[in-house]
Every structure is written in structure tokens, then in C-alpha cells.
Design a protein with these regions (language model features):
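A ligand-binding cleft/hinge motif common to bilobed small-molecule-binding domains
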Residues: 87-90, 104-112, 158-161, 186-219
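Bacterial N-terminal signal peptides that target proteins for export
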Residues: 1-11
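Extracytoplasmic small-molecule ligand-binding "clamshell" domains
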Residues: 25-103
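Ligand-binding cleft/hinge of the Venus flytrap
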Residues: 50-54, 67-76, 152-172, 199-206
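Acidic, polar ligand-binding/catalytic clefts
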Residues: 68, 72, 77-141, 212, ...
């Protein structure tokens, strides 16, 4: 599913993306090269994007693989830091992480406080997980119902403004799902792949009384890699890497390996091989 109505960013954004000299590198690239390590914020144990290894306590999976490829290209090691909806922006702004490779879709508000590589590495929208007995079959059926989301979710506004839901913000997806199971939410609204994994993954049997209300995703949006403001070299370098991921098929390969839905990525790869790339809207002016 390709989102054709995005504003196309200028092709010059990716020029020199794969060859940045240390003398011209911005603060992030300088710091990464000096310490020999890049620190990437990822979603943590959030299947199918992040998987926790109980033996080591470390997070692996789709997002970690992408971070590892960036580290390899820079000739440094990778450190991942689990982030949540309530900590990820602060971690990036405070320098606790160098990049965010998490399920953070482009929004106007986010683009006013952070920078990002304009080429998306995925396209993701929201889904509503509900009880099979709820009678909720469309987004419109959420009017007057309690919809649980993660704090800071970009799904909150359309749920409230477009569909009239009563939005309840919780710390993360597990808390939201527990609230749904406990009856304090009528729907748990999060990115579609994560809820699909919940229903169909290894622990799916405990959710046999629940389902996705509709196959229609809520505001499918470009998922981008986020950087700090005014770090043009980092932004350009990462954008060039993402374009190479699309052209080489790496994103499709890793998505299929970890069970991430790959329909959009397959189409994007075909387009990339023809030299065509999707782009998130141009970066907004920084807020005062």
C-alpha cells in the first residue's frame, strides 16, 4: 500500500549521503566516530519489531538489525537503548541516544522539534483491538467508547476529533492491552503490526476472545528515522542508507525474517530499483 499524497522532498536531501568526511561531520557523527559506537533508541520488547532475548536480557529484532547495518557502515559498534512513547523524544534531545529507529511515524508536531531522514523505512497505521463481543466493526463504532493508546500517540487526535472516542493514554502497549482485557478500555489502538503479532504470535491463544475491529488502518503514515535538529550530515547519511535498504531489498529481507508485514516494503523496493523513492513531508520550521 503506497501513500501517494505525501509532499515530495527535494532530491538534493540525499546528495553525498554515503560519503561524509569527518572534517564536515556534525556533532552526532563526530561523537559516534570518536567513541567508536552509535547508540540507537529502539522500541524494546515490542514484537515483531523488537524481541527480548531472555538469556541475555538484550533486545534484538527488526529495528536492531537496521541499527546494526548503520553501525557497520560507519565502522563502529552498536548499542541499543529501549525507549517508550514517553521517553524517546527526551532521550534523543538529551543525547542519550544518537538516533531513534522506533515506530515513530511522521507528524507535523514531531517535525517541529526533531529532524528526520525523509525517506521512510516503513508505512504503518493504527489498528483497534477489541473483544469479539464488542460489536465494534468500524472506526465509527468507537464513538463514545474508551480507546486506550500509548502516551504521545499520533492516533489520539483522529480517534477523538474524527471518531468521537474517549481517549485514554497509558505508558505502553502491554498496559493498554491489560486495560482492554480488564474491561477498562473498549479498544486498544496501536500500530497494526504490533497488534497483529499479539493476536497471531506465540501468545496468541490468550487473546482468542479478541480481534482487530477492521482491516482499515488509521492514518497510515511514513515511519522515519529521527535525529536531533540541525544535524544535516547525520540526516543525509541516514537517508542515503535507507534508500540503499530499499534498493537492495534489505528491508524486505529483515521484515520477512521477523514477521513484519512487508507489502509496502516490497512495493517500495520495486520503485527504488527504478530510482523512485517516497518521502515524508519536508521538515517543518523549528518552533521558537
Amino acid at each position: 500500500m503506497m501513500k501517494q499524497d505525501w509532499v515530495k522532498a527535494a532530491a538534493a536531501l540525499a546528495l553525498a549521503a554515503l560519503g561524509i568526511g569527518a572534517a564536515h561531520a556534525d556533532a552526532t557523527l563526530d561523537r559516534v566516530k570518536q567513541r567508536g559506537k552509535i547508540v540507537v533508541g529502539v522500541d524494546g520488547a515490542s514484537p515483531p519489531f523488537g524481541l527480548l532475548d531472555p538469556a541475555t536480557g538484550k533486545v534484538g529484532g527488526f529495528q536492531t538489525e537496521l541499527g546494526a547495518d548503520i553501525a557497520r557502515r560507519l565502522g563502529v559498534t552498536l548499542e541499543t537503548v529501549p525507549v517508550t512513547a514517553s521517553t524517546r523524544v527526551q532521550f534523543l534531545q538529551a543525547g542519550k541516544v544518537d538516533l531513534l529507529i522506533a515506530n515513530i511515524q511522521w507528524t507535523q508536531e514531531r517535525s517541529e522539534i526533531l529532524s528526520y531522514a525523509p525517506t521512510p523505512y516503513n508505512l504503518v497505521g493504527g489498528a483497534a483491538m477489541v473483544s469479539k463481543k464488542s460489536g465494534i466493526k468500524r472506526w465509527e463504532d468507537l464513538k463514545g467508547k474508551v480507546a486506550c493508546v500509548s502516551q504521545g500517540s499520533n492516533f489520539a487526535k483522529p480517534l477523538q476529533d474524527t471518531y468521537g472516542a474517549v481517549v485514554k493514554g497509558l505508558r505502553n502497549i502491554p498496559e493498554s492491552l491489560l486495560a482492554l482485557k480488564g474491561g477498562s478500555c473498549d479498544a486498544s489502538v496501536h500500530i497494526q503490526p504490533a497488534l497483529y503479532e499479539t493476536l497471531n504470535g506465540p501468545n496468541g491463544r490468550e487473546w482468542s476472545d479478541f480481534e482487530l475491529a477492521t482491516p482499515d488502518q488509521l492514518i497510515p503514515s511514513p515511519t522515519v528515522i529521527w535525529t536531533r535538529r540541525n544535524e544535516a550530515d547525520t540526516r543525509a547519511f541516514v537517508d542515503g542508507v535507507i534508500r540503499d535498504w530499499h534498493q537492495s531489498g534489505l528491508l524486505v529481507k529483515q521484515a520477512e525474517r521477523y514477521g513484519v508485514p512487508a507489502d509496502y516494503l516490497k512495493q517500495a523496493s520495486i520503485q527504488a530499483q527504478a530510482g523512485k523513492f517516497e518521502s515524508a513531508p519536508p521538515e517543518a520550521l523549528a518552533t521558537p
